[in-house]
């Protein structure tokens, strides 16, 4: 099934998985729980979380775009040179905070 079909699925678990499936999406949501972050800050946080393995700009951009399209995060561009972009959780994204905390508890203290 394609993602649009999965988003229309009657099962909420299938819909949730269609929205957050991806190598970094849950981690991005976790990083944004404390407030807005710039693109580069998110990239560094993900690199730190993966033991120094860098995330490619293409992959990070794709994950951020998909989270934005699914309205879990918002993107705000500020005028100026160089352009500055910040991402933050939307109300829908903030609603996942409890789920993310439960995942961290399940994963144990080393996961936080």
How would you describe each model-predicted region?
Residues 1-12:
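Long, low-complexity, charged/polar intrinsically disordered regions in eukaryotic proteins
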Residues 11-59:
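N-terminal helix-turn-helix DNA-binding core of bacterial DNA-binding proteins
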Residues 70, 99-111:
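Alpha-helical linker/hinge and terminal dimerization helices associated
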Residues 79-100:
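Basic, amphipathic "hinge/linker" alpha-helix immediately C-terminal to the N-terminal HTH DNA-binding motif
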Residues 15, 43-45, 69, 86, ...:
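Non-catalytic interaction surface on structured domains
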Residues 47-82:
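Canonical helix-turn-helix DNA-binding module
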């Amino acid at each position: 099934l394609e993602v649009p079909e999965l988003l229309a699925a009657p099962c909420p678990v299938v819909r949730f998985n269609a929205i957050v499936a991806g190598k970094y999406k849950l981690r991005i949501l976790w990083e944004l729980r404390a407030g807005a972050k710039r693109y580069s800050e998110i990239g560094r946080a993900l690199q730190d979380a993966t033991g120094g393995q860098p995330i490619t700009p293409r992959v990070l951009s794709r994950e951020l775009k998909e989270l934005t399209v699914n309205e879990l995060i918002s993107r705000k561009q500020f005028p100026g040179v160089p352009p500055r972009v910040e991402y933050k959780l939307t109300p829908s994204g903030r609603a996942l905070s409890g789920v993310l905390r439960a995942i961290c508890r399940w994963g144990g203290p080393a996961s936080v």
